[in-house]
Each structure stands twice: as structure tokens, then as C-alpha cells.
Amino acid sequence: MKITLLGTGTSQGVPVLGCDCEVCKSTDSHDKRLRTSALVETESTRILIDCGPDFREQMLKQPFRKIDGVLITHIHYDHVAGLDDLRPYCQFGDIEIYSEEDVANGLKNNMPYCFPDDNENKLYPGVPKLNLNTIHVHETFKIGDLDIMPIRIKHDTMSI
């Protein structure tokens, strides 16, 4: 198994625009960090954890091949804003999105053009083909050859 940390920065990335702190003013390349995301890969499976606004830039550095699933930890913009940029990966087939129900509902509200109601809207050309899958804490599920067990953690005061 290979885990690539695509981004380890804050919700604004590092450096933060307008910040004069030592880290943000640093010329050290280690102080230039994109927003949080990770790529988990085995010989046959590729999973993205969170898909923020830096997704496209992050993936330009990776081999272009199928993404078997995307795990979304929570609905914050810095974890979901790159979902529309999954479009090129849809040439391999629909992309499975895995999240808790509240996150799935937030995605439907924020990106209704990606998740049409069967009776009302239809996908128009160029929209990423995303399928929502609800996951539950402490219930193992499978993506490819990986078994995944979601756990609850604290994100400041919010449980995710």
C-alpha cells in the first residue's frame, strides 16, 4: 500500500494570503503546502481522501489513472471544492463518493447539477458522474481490495 499526502496545509493553504508570520514568509519549499488530501493506492485500487480546491494541481503530479472511490470526511469547502474537477476521471466510469448521510445531503445541496433528482433534472454533458454511497461509523465497507472502517474524530469542536 502506498499513501501519498497530496496536501497537508490549513483550510486556506500555506502560505495564507496576507499573512506575515514566519512560516508564510518562509522561502523553504516545505512551508508551501496545499490543502488537505491524500491518495491511497494498492496494486489494483486507488482511493482519494477529500477533494479540495487544490485537487487539480495536486493530481497534475500523479499518474492519470482510474480513481476507484473518493472518501469525503466532512462538508467543509476545503474538503469538497475539487469534486467538479473529477470530470476527466469519469472517462474510466462513474466515480463513487463515500460519505456520511449529512455530508451527502450537503453535496446534493451545494452541487445539485451533479446529483439530479431522477424525475426533475438530468445530467448535462460535461458534468462529473458521481454516485453517492452512505457510510456509517464503525461499519466496515470495501473499495476494491481495501476494507475501510470509518471512525469518529474531533475537528475542533465538530465531530467528523
Language-model segments: which ranges?
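Binuclear metal-dependent hydrolase catalytic cores
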Residues: 1-160
